[in-house]
Amino acid sequence: MKNVTRLVGYLTATFFFSSLGANAAGKMDSQNILSGKLLKTTSIHIHPFSTSEADLGNPKFRDTANAMAKSAPHLLATDIVESLRSSGFTSVTLDESEGMIPADTLNVTGRFTRLDPGSQNLRVWIGFGAGESKVCISGEVTDSSGNKLADFADCRNGLGWGSSGPQADKGADILGERLAGFLIDWADS
């Protein structure tokens, strides 16, 4: 019995630690540079991503999804701005920024295509990925004339346990880091 308990503990720990990093780092699901060179001195404005057409998942959990729809755009935008600034971009703004936005600014716009809180009950009682949340985005980078320079899309699955709200917030943070990573790689290429 002692060995069975150890084995179950080992398998649980292995599953837990391997899923913590699942899908967290790395490239976005889709990222395409259509034209242009991005410099770290280029002015970039991050617009809050729209949630108006997002799939909010099961209607039973709509109240949680609506709360996610209110917080996710700001979390995503601020995370992108913070990541870009810390990597050396010198002129990155968002709607809350003070001052004028330069006329030749690139715009990062997009939308949440899915904000599904999943089922907290399934995560608590079943675990192992049951009831996981999912956050998906898509968008584009355009120049000041509206010409598309790049497009992207990405999804982030929750870890499969715990409360829906923090999972969605973490999903938005990770998507923000991955989108910023795409822009950083573009500037470094």
Predicted regions located by residue number:
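Bacterial N-terminal signal peptides that target proteins for export
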Residues: M1-G9
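Bacterial N-terminal signal peptides
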Residues: G9-S19
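A structural "domain/chain start" motif
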Residues: L20-D79, C155-R156, I184-S189
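Surface-exposed short loop/turn segments
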Residues: K27, D95-N147, G160-G162
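Generic beta-structure capping elements
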Residues: H47-F49, R111-T113, S144, D154-C155
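Short secondary-structure boundary motifs at beta->alpha junctions and helix caps
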Residues: F61-M68, A130, T142-D188
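Mid-chain, structured segments of secreted extracytoplasmic proteins
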Residues: K70-A103, N107-R111
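Sec-exported extracytoplasmic/periplasmic mature domains
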Residues: V81-F89, P117, A180, I184-D188
